[in-house]
Amino acid sequence: MNQPKSPITVLIVDDSPFMRLTLQKILSQDPEIKVLDTARDGKEGIEKLQALRPQVVTMDIEMPQIDGLQALGEIMRWQPTPIIILSALTTEGAQASVKALEAGAFDVVAKPSGGPGADIQALARDLIDKVKAAAQVNLGRLGKKGAVSRISSASGSRPPWTAGAASENTNRLSSPGSTSSTLGSAKGRSLDSGEALPKYPVEIVAIGTSTGGPSALQAVLTQLPGNLPVPVLVAQHMPPGFTAPLAQRLNGMSPLTIREGVHGEALKAGTIYFAPAGKQMQVQSRGSQLILHIGDESPITTLYHPSVDVMFMSLAKEVGKGTLGVVMTGMGNDGLRGMREIKERGGYAIAEAEETCVVYGMPRAIVDAGLANRVAPLGEIARHIVECVQRR
């Protein structure tokens, strides 16, 4: 006879009595979750965490004495625990949440913006799903960004890619200005002879990720060379208002331009475009250019805005075999349908290896479906992207 599964234990840390009560009611609705206690600030939260040892913590950012960011740092240093940040939909809240994710927070949930009704119901669905996912997290990956070596654009060795060759790949892109004649070569381990590279020139790179994504994106995007001859699109599951601060923060760490995409703009090589949270990002051909189409409409029914599937499907249609799709850490299987279409049209797929994923959900769907051309740990993904782009 099977023993009943023990409920997931949770500690709630929030300075608002209303939010503590609301979160407790929400989580207590699910028989698989048990709220052990609540705390009024970061200091009390740390003390109760040490005493109760919950599996998951929900934590507000702005609190007296010790705020959420300080408490997160202490917890990750001494007792790593999956922490779900609850953040207000404000510029300050979004910026603090991005810092929390980089410091090792599991995920972010947006607090209700005003009217209880629908907002509370949406919060309940999101929070319960993320608490259950957090309980399965690879604790060893929280806050880690992967062992990556910088891919230098000033390497002494000349890679097989040249500016002349790249022009055949990027004839639909707006010029980003003058670039060096060689793409930064990939340092470190070279590919095994048995590992296949794309059959067709890569015109565009698209990356999809969810839980654990901000840290993973930092590990990958900041290691790409400044003369990358193709554009990069990113769909990261986040609450509305949170992708702009993330892109802005990463932009300061990268030799490439990283920002939110703008509806109607032409894609440029050497620029990384984030899909705005709450919207869908697709591409459309206009003459010799690829144009971003950003809006509310979605060609498929999906819970995610932005959706990796929507982005991938658009690229499969407009770019086809010139698409390099990358799926990294995240819950669920968003990206599976779109990646299948990319592969059907001759494109190439990279999936993050289980060993480095915070949550091995989205990449696992790609691997289990037999779609991945290459499965790589986080620290090697940037190198593989460069090797695929410079493939002739």
Curated annotation (Swiss-Prot):
Residue spans of biased composition, Low complexity class: 173-185
One family name in Pfam for this protein: Response_reg
Domain Response regulatory as annotated: residue spans: 9-126
Molecular functions (GO terms): phosphorelay response regulator activity; protein-glutamate methylesterase activity; protein-glutamine glutaminase activity
Subcellular location, record wording: Cytoplasm
Major site of localization recorded for this protein: cytoplasm
UniProt EC number: 3.1.1.61, 3.5.1.44
Matching PROSITE patterns: CHEB, RESPONSE_REGULATORY
One CC-aspect GO term: cytoplasm
Domain spans labelled CheB-type methylesterase: 198-392
Record keyword Cytoplasm present: yes
Active site, per annotation: 210, 237, 334
GO biological process: chemotaxis
PTM annotation: Phosphorylated by CheA. Phosphorylation of the N-terminal regulatory domain activates the methylesterase activity.
Record comment regarding domains: Contains a C-terminal catalytic domain, and an N-terminal region which modulates catalytic activity.
Family per record: Belongs to the CheB family.
Name of the molecule in the record: Protein-glutamate methylesterase/protein-glutamine glutaminase
Lineage of source species: Bacteria, Bacillati, Bacillota, Clostridia, Eubacteriales
